[in-house]
Amino acid sequence: MSWLDKLLPPKIKQTDPKSRKGIPEGLWVKCPSCEAVLYRNDVDANLHVCPKCDHHMRIGARERLDALLDPEGRYEIGQEIVPVDSLKFKDSRKYPDRLKEAMDETGETDAMVVMGGAIHTLPVVAACFEFSFMGGSMGSVVGERFARGAQNALEQHVPFICFTASGGARMQESLLSLMQMAKTTAMLTKLSEAKLPFISVLTDPTMGGVSASFAFLGDVVIAEPKALIGFAGPRVIEQTVREKLPEGFQRAEFLLKTGAIDMIVDRRKMRDEIAQLLALLQRQPADALA
């Protein structure tokens, strides 16, 4: 027994590390904005919005779709499509190794989830990026799932909604990923010709090839509060132009002020706001919504 053990009262003893295995981890989360320490269950119940400062944290694709769509009648689109290493690409690591790691961490097979369903009984098709999967980068699978979602909306004659959260085109797929920019915008042209609404919701972050292709092509373009939206990141721009950027540059509020987006909507009100917009765009009475 050490001299310190002799001084400590009997009740103040270091617990056995083996006994700590039953203690659950991740019960608390720190807000990246106000740095408040929050109970994770409260954050989850608040759709990952800080109850102290209203900061919108990042949220998973399926959790977002769960909050958007009615619980009944959902169906997934394009889940059978999986990525392949057509170019045998290798940077610091092999592409298949990166894919496997992302799949294990997220439980998804790529960076987009597409579902058909309804919002307050109004039928829709909704696509959502999974940012945790390789930064939400757009590759062949993301482009194909987006296209199939839009095609399904055409066939069902229902509106199409997309929530973006992406760093841009997927480097590991080179030109195949860049081709998705044209592919996705071409599908939106078909939706426009069919007079079907497309609502684009820009979340943090929406950058690169996604922002440069379909993200701003919505009949209504919505953003979440303080979302980072642009092509190149602010640090890259500052290093290039060698000037300090204005406060809030490339944030949702800046884009609203300059007319690049139509509205900013709190995540907790998103479902109701989109339902109201769909009723308006389809000339349905708003008070008829369930």
UniProtKB/Swiss-Prot annotation:
GO molecular function: acetyl-CoA carboxylase activity; ATP binding; carboxyl- or carbamoyltransferase activity; zinc ion binding
GO cellular component term, pick one: acetate CoA-transferase complex
Classification via PROSITE patterns: COA_CT_NTER (PS50980)
Places the protein is found: Cytoplasm
Enzyme class: transferase
GO annotation terms (biological process): fatty acid biosynthetic process; malonyl-CoA biosynthetic process
Known catalytic reactions: N(6)-carboxybiotinyl-L-lysyl-[protein] + acetyl-CoA = N(6)-biotinyl-L-lysyl-[protein] + malonyl-CoA
ZnF C4-type span: 31-53
SUPFAM superfamilies the UniProt entry points to: ClpP/crotonase
Superkingdom per UniProt: Bacteria
Annotated ranges, domain CoA carboxyltransferase N-terminal: 27-290
Requisite cofactors: Zn(2+)
First-listed, main subcellular location of the protein, grouped into a coarse class: cytoplasm
Pfam name, any one: Carboxyl_trans
Residues the record lists as binding Zn(2+): C31, C34, C50, C53
Pathway: Lipid metabolism; malonyl-CoA biosynthesis; malonyl-CoA from acetyl-CoA: step 1/1
Cofactor notes: Binds 1 zinc ion per subunit.
Entry keywords, A to Z: ATP-binding, Cytoplasm, Fatty acid biosynthesis, Fatty acid metabolism, Lipid biosynthesis, Lipid metabolism, Metal-binding, Nucleotide-binding, Transferase, Zinc, Zinc-finger
EC number in record: 2.1.3.15
NCBIfam families for this protein: accD
Family as reported in the entry's similarity comment: Belongs to the AccD/PCCB family.
Subunit structure: Acetyl-CoA carboxylase is a heterohexamer composed of biotin carboxyl carrier protein (AccB), biotin carboxylase (AccC) and two subunits each of ACCase subunit alpha (AccA) and ACCase subunit beta (AccD).
Listed PANTHER family: ACETYL-COENZYME A CARBOXYLASE CARBOXYL TRANSFERASE SUBUNIT BETA, CHLOROPLASTIC
Biological role: Component of the acetyl coenzyme A carboxylase (ACC) complex. Biotin carboxylase (BC) catalyzes the carboxylation of biotin on its carrier protein (BCCP) and then the CO(2) group is transferred by the transcarboxylase to acetyl-CoA to form malonyl-CoA.
The protein, known as: Acetyl-coenzyme A carboxylase carboxyl transferase subunit beta
Organism the protein comes from: Burkholderia multivorans (strain ATCC 17616 / 249)
